[in-house]
């Protein structure tokens, strides 16, 4: 027996898709054809006249606002926030801080924010992950950060991710890291995670974001170069399987591709030291302690399947995944990555 739910079929034209559905029905499979896709797993899908696709989740944002007891649109006095978080705020455990009053289900809100971030809203990835770190023992400062984020989401509820493929671009990945960004020199003993760095990366195909992540590193980096190199390694763990999948699809002549998929990956990083480490196999006394697992991608670089490129800090699209950024930077990166 085989049961499936919410399945998608994609093809170069509707005729082939309709034929597949007919063949499956002939095989006595109970299938309901819902027609052209408009909604999938809570994500609104709007195909526009210019060929772009707009993905958004306004209903989930409405649910978050309801859970926080925020008034509906146009009602009540709710201050608007134009950034997901305060640009100067770094959340910590704050063990001696004011207790959270329990006015909303913190864990439930975090679950909704995580789903929203992973599907359509990379602009909230950093602060959503930061708030999620304190789910077991949330404090008042963490609840305030969630409410700030909710006011930003209320202001941008109908926005999401705009996909507009650019045929001249293949697989690209932007990697950035914030070295020991949570470090609290006044109380390092209160939160051992403050010594950890955070990396973020965005994986794109034809200019469209596919995967993004904001992640606290498990290893303690000893320098900014190390933290960036760790970020490169983790990002390419996700990129390499994508490249292998594209290679198989190209080999099998998959009809879903109107043009042959590009198998080369460009990686963009703003740290020259990390790029040099990624390119060379030479023994280096200062980096010999790095785990061998971090070097897994070097053969791909040697073969030319992955090329490494220096990018300026302003053009580092993953910057807003590693720390709170100023409004001017947010607007620029959000337009570049999300299309609005």
What are these regions, as identified by a protein language model?
Residues 31-58, 88-89, 269-273:
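Short, conserved secondary-structure transition motifs
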């Amino acid at each position: 027996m085989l049961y499936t739910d919410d399945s998608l079929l994609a093809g170069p034209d509707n005729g082939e898709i309709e034929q597949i559905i007919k063949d499956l029905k002939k095989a006595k499979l109970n299938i309901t054809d819902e027609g052209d896709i408009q909604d999938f797993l809570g994500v609104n899908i709007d195909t526009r006249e210019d060929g772009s696709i707009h993905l958004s989740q306004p209903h989930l944002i409405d649910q978050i606002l309801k859970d926080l007891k925020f008034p509906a649109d146009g009602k009540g006095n709710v201050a608007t926030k134009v950034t997901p978080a305060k640009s100067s705020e770094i959340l910590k455990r704050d063990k001696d801080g004011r207790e959270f009053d329990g006015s909303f289900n913190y864990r439930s809100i975090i679950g909704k924010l995580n789903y929203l971030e992973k599907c359509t809203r990379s602009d909230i990835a950093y602060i959503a992950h930061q708030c999620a770190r304190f789910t077991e023992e949330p404090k008042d400062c963490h609840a305030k950060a969630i409410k700030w984020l909710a006011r930003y989401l209320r202001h941008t509820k109908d926005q999401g991710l705009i996909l507009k493929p650019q045929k001249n671009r293949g697989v690209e990945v932007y990697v950035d890291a914030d070295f020991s960004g949570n470090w609290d020199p006044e109380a390092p003993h209160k939160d051992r995670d403050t010594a950890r760095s955070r990396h973020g990366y965005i994986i794109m195909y034809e200019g469209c974001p596919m995967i993004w992540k904001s992640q606290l590193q498990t290893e303690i980096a000893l320098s900014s170069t190390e933290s960036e190199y760790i970020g490169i390694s983790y990002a390419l763990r996700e990129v390499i399987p994508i490249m292998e999948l594209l290679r198989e699809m190209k080999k099998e002549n998959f009809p879903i591709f109107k043009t042959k998929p590009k198998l080369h990956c460009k990686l963009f990083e703003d740290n020259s030291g990390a790029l040099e480490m990624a390119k060379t196999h030479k023994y280096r006394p200062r980096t010999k302690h790095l785990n061998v697992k971090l070097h897994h991608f070097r053969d791909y670089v040697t073969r030319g399947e992955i090329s490494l490129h220096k990018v300026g800090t302003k053009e580092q699209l993953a910057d807003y995944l590693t720390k709170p950024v100023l409004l001017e930077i947010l607007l620029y990166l959000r337009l570049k990555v999300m299309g609005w």
